Amino acid sequence: MIAFTDIVGMDLAKQALMLLAVDPSLGGVVIPSTVGSGKSTLARAFADILPEGTPFVELPLNVTEDRLIGGVDLEATLASGQRVVQHGVLSKAHKGVLYVDSLSLLDSSAVSHIMDAMSRGAVIVEREGLSEVHPADFMLVGTYDPSDGEVRMGLLDRIGIIVPFTPVNDYRARKQIVSLVMGTRNEEDTQDELRMLRGIIGAAREQLHHVSITNEQIKGLIQTAISLGVEGNRVDIFAIRAAIANAALNQRTEVDDEDLKLAMKLVLVPRATRMPEREPNPEEMAQDEPPPQEEQPQDEAEDQNAPPDEADSDADEEQEETPDMIEELMMDAVETELPDNILNISLASKKKAKSGSRGEALNNKRGRFVRSQPGEIKSGKVALIPTLISAAPWQASRKAEQAKKGIKSTAALIIGKDDIKIKRFRDKSGTLFIFMVDASGSMALNRMRQAKGAVASLLQNAYVHRDQVSLISFRGKQAQVLLPPSQSVDRAKRELDVLPTGGGTPLASALLTGWETAKQARAKGITQIMFVMITDGRGNIPLGAAYDPNATKASKEELEKEVEALALSIQADGIASIVVDTQMNYLSRGEAPKLAQKLGGRYFYLPNAKAEQIVEAALS
């Protein structure tokens, strides 16, 4: 295994891990990067620089709830005749490190338990008559590939440092990596370097409580967080602690500008939702000033000083009339009144579910243990207490029967096949909302601002319920997946904010892309899926246009047949739908309502719609 000091490059990530070693109250370090970048090797090597005896526990992705938080050790309990408690992975990481590779793929139930443990510093085990509290105060180190999906925001909120980095591409560095792996390392030199580094970190831990930071520096970090659009006071505290930890690592008693810059780089910038605009310097302003002009007649001067929108309106109209020109229109989302429960209403129309339990389903493998039922050992996890209770009344008769047969049994209990009880769990199977936003030229003429606002409000509703979202835009010749299924609502909003518009309306491509995304999600265990289509419903680009330049033209009947065939297939597949119509009344020919009918979904008219009107329409 490669040691921490032998790893080439990745300086920022190594520095982040060293800060965590100095101040465990930073919560943890998350390292997102592509496959083969060395992130997992670095994370595992983190154990080298921790104090001797510090637990370093790796969490498998397929961990069960019993192994994660602990419970009754069935084998030991049956052998001893007394209940034996088994500690889970989280409590084994107490005062140490919990490492998770492919963090974004970790089961949502496991993520919830980790979040709870990080908040409490302990794990509460309550199951099968057992109620215990196990200490679980640990640092979390996670690595993942962003292409696999995003890490749950609630978990990232509890982790101080996020360090994205790219694979080493410098020739000399890559040659050094190859030589290191293929050659012979001097183990003695490596151990000397590790001892030295552990000594530096130990000294920094002692120095940590002697480092001071001024009110002005704290104010600067907070103002930076605000300007970057970073929300939450917890992040401010993480940034302050990171700056202090770096000062301690460098054996300083006061935080300086370098410490503040590093804290911003590791804590604030990765969480930024916007980037502040740089103010032009005096030289740039001087260069931008127009040269002095000769005096002109007043009327002519007034014409030249007219607002750009008015002065260039004729030119703009001429450009809009050019058919070969695709105009990019960037618009900001604005508030739109849509009911908070619009998603719940439409889900209820497909599948009746109790409030607060959206997407929950019973299974034999994972989730919260709710009850037991008769079954075979191979079909699930044995419910120990119910099994023992079922077997207890028959012990005397079973032992007597064995005695008649001349069988001597030393077993404390004789458990029959009919006594076995299997655990039943309730787990959130997950709800995926696939937002399909029409970004064609016709949308730009209608209500793109309101459409973006509508999606933003629906995204917020999905965030509250911890659902997954996917964002698909369709314009030009085909649809494009801007965001694969993810719990990162913030990322979806960022993609939405910069969504360009223009070109044709490949409605059939949008339906096909959404359907393929839904199929992939189902293969990963997501059972409830909903389409949210923001469109005027006026498709004019056939499916083949993305592959065949000659297929851009099709008759209205052919286009309608494509859309109808896909819509009916999607409805037959049990996917719920909402169609939000953005068309103006005087232009509408009823395309969006027809689309909603073919999908078997709910229809809402966006312009001028009020929340109560949409709710009434959904319930009617």
Swiss-Prot record:
For ATP, which residues are the binding ones?
Answer: 33-40
Region: Disordered; residue ranges are 272-322
Which UniProt keyword terms apply here?
A: ATP-binding, Bacteriochlorophyll biosynthesis, Chlorophyll biosynthesis, Ligase, Nucleotide-binding, Photosynthesis
BP GO annotations: bacteriochlorophyll biosynthetic process; photosynthesis
What are the VWFA domain coordinates in residue numbering? 432-620
- Give the record's pathway: Porphyrin-containing compound metabolism; bacteriochlorophyll biosynthesis
Stored InterPro entries: AAA+_ATPase, BchD/ChlD_VWA, ChlI/MoxR_AAA_lid, Mg_chelatase_ATPase-dsu, Mg_chelatse_chII-like_cat_dom, P-loop_NTPase, VWF_A, vWFA_dom_sf
Q: What is its EC number?
A: 6.6.1.1
Reactions accelerated catalytically: protoporphyrin IX + Mg(2+) + ATP + H2O = Mg-protoporphyrin IX + ADP + phosphate + 3 H(+)
Q: What does this protein do?
A: Involved in bacteriochlorophyll biosynthesis; introduces a magnesium ion into protoporphyrin IX to yield Mg-protoporphyrin IX.
Q: Which family does it belong to?
A: Belongs to the Mg-chelatase subunits D/I family.
Give the protein's recorded name. Answer: Magnesium-chelatase 67 kDa subunit
Q: Which organism is it from?
A: Chlorobaculum tepidum (strain ATCC 49652 / DSM 12025 / NBRC 103806 / TLS) (Chlorobium tepidum)
